[in-house]
Amino acid sequence: MISASAVKELRERTGAGMMACKKALSEANGDSEKAVEILREKGLAAAAKKAGRVASEGLVVAYVNEDGKSGAIAEVNCETDFVSANEDFKALAENIVKLAAKSNSNTVEELLEENYVDGSSKLKDVITALIAKLGENINLRRFTKFSNENGTIQSYIHGDGRIGVLVNLNADKISDEVHTLAKDICMQIAAANPLYLDETSVDQTALDKEREIYKVQALNEGKPEKIVEKMVEGRIKKYLKEVCLLDQVWVRDSDLTISKLVAKKSKELSAAISIADFVRFERGEGIEKKEENFAEEVQKQMQQSK
């Protein structure tokens, strides 16, 4: 028996119709992940990259040192948007990412043991104290940091901490134009959500899965088997252009890909420029959010403020 709540959740994840979701869940024996694949194979779930992303609250924050040689990005989560807008919570998030950028810690567990920015307590104890004060669970979910003595680090935060990007750019000459290029690349990543730098970094297992899905789609469309492989390879090429940063069309000029943009700027500035790495965080991606009645949520906040 497929529950209404399971159908509702699958519909929210994929955008497919109610009956299509119910049928997919039935075929998948209630397995929601398998149901997503079934819907994709039938062409009913167009937003594949969004599948599985359920909103959660908190902030994505970034910090780059003044010399532009190192920086960090972090996601700090809380339970409601009321707390994510709280000044104490925002200050905590900003201080966490500064600490991450300047410390030697490489894991969340290590960073939690670091002394807080004012040196008064360990980070984990500061978080615990704020939990007690605000009445919500707060946690440092993840962080990444880059350093580059032969280039520059740039960051971009979009939508009040909903999306954050950190870019590591190699450049043998640093100028305002190089910083602008790094910022443009950050905004490209925020908007177009690439999954990889280039084709050589694509996960082969993920690529094989895409290839199988495209094959099923083509067969479902009634295409002859002899041309299915050619269609699949064409769709794989299109997929790679969508998910590989260097192959993406630049959002500000459709005549340029990002690789061509970097080459163009390198020539104009007489500099050797290349993208070393990047990371993109989206608040709450992959985290299940507990649904609450809005009126009850407001009442809860009012009670906490008394």
Swiss-Prot record:
PROSITE patterns: EF_TS_1, EF_TS_2. One of its GO terms (molecular function) is translation elongation factor activity. It is found in: Cytoplasm. SUPFAM superfamilies: Elongation factor Ts (EF-Ts), dimerisation domain, UBA-like. Keywords: Cytoplasm, Elongation factor, Protein biosynthesis. InterPro entries: EF-Ts_dimer_sf, Transl_elong_EFTs/EF1B, Transl_elong_EFTs/EF1B_dimer, Transl_elong_Ts_CS, UBA-like_sf. Residues 80-83 are annotated as: Involved in Mg(2+) ion dislocation from EF-Tu. It comes from the Bacteria. Disulfide bonds: none annotated. It comes from Clostridium acetobutylicum (strain ATCC 824 / DSM 792 / JCM 1419 / IAM 19013 / LMG 5710 / NBRC 13948 / NRRL B-527 / VKM B-1787 / 2291 / W). This is Elongation factor Ts. The keyword Protein biosynthesis applies. Its main location: cytoplasm. One of its GO terms (cellular component) is cytoplasm. Associates with the EF-Tu.GDP complex and induces the exchange of GDP to GTP. It remains bound to the aminoacyl-tRNA.EF-Tu.GTP complex up to the GTP hydrolysis stage on the ribosome. Gene3D superfamilies: 1.10.286.20, DNA helicase RuvA subunit, C-terminal domain, Elongation factor Ts, dimerisation domain. Belongs to the EF-Ts family.
